[in-house]
């Protein structure tokens, strides 16, 4: 079974109204279901997607997550220091800025070894590296 991390962007694309690339990500989510992929995200990604979606899509999205469509990894408060370290490492103002959701996914990839990711942030995730130097395989 394949394991895939999911960023907020693809979830917003699928659940948002008239979003660009919605079909691409809808097809990927269908493929994930058909092939029994293990989909994982983090609470910051769920919060970001929820914030970007308007009602009633927001409610549909949260019910989808609540029904177990993907695993939501929690983190301990102490991990925020690690996230800040990642954010500082990858922020080059004013050009680029790593947000909390991205930092949480890089941390999750490092913790689990999963480097395949669904994201609309291709430019950013092409730059991010795990401590062992591995990059991300972007779907």
Write out the residue ranges for each language-model feature.
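Metal-dependent nucleic-acid phosphoesterase active-site entry motif
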Residues: 1-20
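PIN-domain endoribonuclease scaffold, especially VapC-family toxins
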Residues: 2-4, 23-97, 103, 107, ...
């Amino acid at each position: 079974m394949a394991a895939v991390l999911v960023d907020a962007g693809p979830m917003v694309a699928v659940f948002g109204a008239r979003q660009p690339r919605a079909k691409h990500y809808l097809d990927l989510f269908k493929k994930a279901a058909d092939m029994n992929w293990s989909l994982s995200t983090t609470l910051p990604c769920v919060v970001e997607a929820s914030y970007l979606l308007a009602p009633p899509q927001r409610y549909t999205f949260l019910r989808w997550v609540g029904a177990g469509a993907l695993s939501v990894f929690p983190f301990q408060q102490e991990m925020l220091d690690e996230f800040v370290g990642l954010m500082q490492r990858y922020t080059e103002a004013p050009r680029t800025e790593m947000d909390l959701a991205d930092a949480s996914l890089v941390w999750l990839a490092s913790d689990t070894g999963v480097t395949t990711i669904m994201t609309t942030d291709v430019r950013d995730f092409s730059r991010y590296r795990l401590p062992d130097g591995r990059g991300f395989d972007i779907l």
